[in-house]
Amino acid sequence: MLQSNEYFSGKVKSIGFSSSSTGRASVGVMVEGEYTFSTAEPEEMTVINGALNVLLPDATDWQVYEAGSVFNVPGHSEFHLQVAEPTSYLCRYL
C-alpha cells in the first residue's frame, strides 16, 4: 500500500512504500528551500536527481550530496537540508 506525505506547506512530498528489495522506504521530491527533519529510526538517504546540502547531527560543516550519493542519519536525531533546485530522493528506514 502507498502512503502519501506532505511537509513544509507542500514543498516536500513523498510516497511511502514497502518492498522485498528495499524494505520500508519513501521516495519524494523537495523544491528549493531550507528544511529540518527529525528521525525516529536510522535512515539511509539516496539522492536520485539534483543535490542536497546537508548538515548531519553533531557535524559542524555542511556537505553536498549530488545524484547517486548516499548518506546516513542516526535515529532519534535531527538533520538540516538546503535545497537549491528541485531534488528527488529515496529514504530507506533501517
Curated annotation (Swiss-Prot):
One Pfam family cited in the UniProt record for this chain: Ppnp
Lineage summary: Bacteria, Pseudomonadati, Pseudomonadota, Gammaproteobacteria, Enterobacterales
Cellular compartments per GO CC: cytosol
Keyword Disulfide bond assigned: no
This protein's UniProt keywords: Glycosyltransferase, Transferase
Coiled-coil stretches: none
Catalysis performed (reactions): a purine D-ribonucleoside + phosphate = a purine nucleobase + alpha-D-ribose 1-phosphate; adenosine + phosphate = alpha-D-ribose 1-phosphate + adenine; cytidine + phosphate = cytosine + alpha-D-ribose 1-phosphate; guanosine + phosphate = alpha-D-ribose 1-phosphate + guanine
PANTHER family: PYRIMIDINE/PURINE NUCLEOSIDE PHOSPHORYLASE (PTHR36540), PYRIMIDINE_PURINE NUCLEOSIDE PHOSPHORYLASE (PTHR36540:SF1)
Known EC number: 2.4.2.1, 2.4.2.2
Role according to the record: Catalyzes the phosphorolysis of diverse nucleosides, yielding D-ribose 1-phosphate and the respective free bases. Can use uridine, adenosine, guanosine, cytidine, thymidine, inosine and xanthosine as substrates. Also catalyzes the reverse reactions.
Species: Shigella dysenteriae serotype 1 (strain Sd197)
Family the entry assigns: Belongs to the nucleoside phosphorylase PpnP family.
Protein's UniProt name: Pyrimidine/purine nucleoside phosphorylase
Gene Ontology molecular function: guanosine phosphorylase activity; purine-nucleoside phosphorylase activity; thymidine phosphorylase activity; uridine phosphorylase activity
